[in-house]
Amino acid sequence: ITASKVLEIALTGRDCGQEERAPMCGVPYHAVDGYISKLIENGYKAAICEQLEDPALAKGIVKRDVIRVITPGTIIDQAMLDEKTNNYLCCIYLDKGFGMSYVDISTGELHVTENISLNDFLKNSTNDLLIEEINKIAPSEIISNKLTGNEPVDSMINLSEGLSLDECKEIVLKHFKLVSLDSLGLKDNFHAVTSLGMLLNYLNETQKTSLDHINKLHFYKVGEYLQLDGSTRKNLELIETIRGKKGPGTLYHVIDNTMTAMGGRLLKKWIEEPLKNIKHINLRLDAVEELYKNVMASNNIKECLRSVYDIERLISRIVYGSCNGRDMNSLKQSLSNLPDLKAELSGLSSELFAEIYSKFDELKDIFDIIDKAIVEEPPVSIKEGGILKTGYDDELDELKEITVNGKNWISGLQTKERDATGIKNLKIGFNKVFGYYLEVTKSYLKDVPEYYIRKQTLANCERYVTPELKEMEAKILNADEQIMKLEYELFLEIRQFISSQVKSIQETAYNIAVVDTINSLAIAAVKNNYVRPEMNSKGYMSITDGRHPVIEKIMKNEMFVPNDTYIDNREYRMSIITGPNMAGKSTYMRQVALIALL
């Protein structure tokens, strides 16, 4: 009833005995993704139920079960996701502080943090930190053992019974195949472990499949990055404008020259989590400067990345078991660019690029198996054959030869029967209900030989079979059935092989994202005539001819007037800015903040 209203489809019903009628509604299977997306957008969950056994082999009613529950935070279908935005599922554990874990199951990215309040005086500030962390990651779904007291956040929370610490430890260790929490860096972080255990338990209950792509945990401390509260992020218009729109008018739009979805997501993360460590800042700046000065290398890298698909989300679909041959070819196409990209990296000398080059895996074995196995234009379905190339498997080739020879024989039978019967318009056809048949129009029925067996009568023709046609049909259909079964089994083997390499693929995908993001910043610097800052820890900031990076791009017919800034932590701790309304006071302040972030 609810689905029919939300999806705007007809509500029907079926008698189910005792004068009751079961309400029903349905959608075409091939178009189900669009309807599921609409349900999720309206705040509902969708349970996917499938047959668990072959109907031909089942005894009695075919066994069915829920194989997955799709929720706002567990979407993996790329059509339902923004390619350059993470889709986080967040889990919070509240008890004298908080533990927070969040995951993007479409990429395998997993983060964990915690903050403990030792007394009531710190309780409010701890809660504020939690709300700021939640606002920063902007999750699609939140699970928590308690409400936070913040109305916008609480409206998103699904309350869940908290698990015990021991239960959560067991879940975490089982997932990561470990015997101790030490190697995860969570030895004494009980709030973090509890939130992580609750998160993984929720995923196990809803996804009911392998989560092997979620294999790397990033534990961080709140405050490890520069803290930007919600008001600051909103007013600086980092990712969205004040009106909540993406695109022009944001810092992200000005500096986003990424060529891949992975790079686009990482750039957003870097903007929202500014570094505080000068060494790490200079490491990035060294790499940006190298590409800024080497425009040819920058352009070559850009071209290498142009046809790279979203490897992070592709490998997640493969591990999930929801990929098809087209996903495999998208991965192959992406990997085909890696040798050229690695060659470009070999000519770069900055420490960050040297480190990436030293561990850059071209994943040649994965490229080779896909290239050898998958046809150039595979079908969407993986259970109906037509996926694998000739030459990949000997047994499969033999079966294909049977069908080819059989179909050639059937084509020859048409000519043979026309000559034998004199029926000039006799033709051979096929459908899934009646199989192969000989079709004769009404005007030639008098010429039909006795050995023809009537199969079907239509308005203008009769359809027949012959013993030899039935025999060949059985051979072809049997071979076709075996081909579909064998191709499916071989495809699963290929999928399993690629899934076993998930860590290497994810590491390469991350390295590609870093290169893409660094190159994006270098391109932005060239386009906008930015200069490299000199970082110091002496407590002062000096800006000469500073410009607001966003407003100068919006101004079409006017030139932004650059201005200077100097502040320190001694004599010039404060500047008083005066002027009439709309004179640019807030623009100047935001300009300084954005330059500091850049």
Which stretches of residues belong to each language-model region?
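Charged, surface-exposed helical/loop "interaction arms" that form contiguous linear patches used
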Residues: Y320, S334-N337, T390-G391, E417-N425, ...
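Cytosolic, long alpha-helical scaffolding segments
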Residues: I366, A373, V380, Y436-Y452
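Short beta-strand motif preference
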Residues: F98-Y102, L438, I543
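Charged catalytic and DNA/RNA-contacting regions of genome-maintenance
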Residues: I1-E290, N299, E303-V319, C323-T415
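Extended, charged helical/alpha-beta scaffold domains that provide interaction surfaces
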Residues: S411, R418-K442, P449
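ATPase nucleotide-binding head domains, primarily ABC-like/P-loop NTPase cores
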Residues: V6, N189, M259-T260, G264, ...
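Extended, charged coiled-coil "arm/hinge" scaffolds of SMC/Rad50-like chromosome-maintenance ATPases
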Residues: L458, E462-Q496
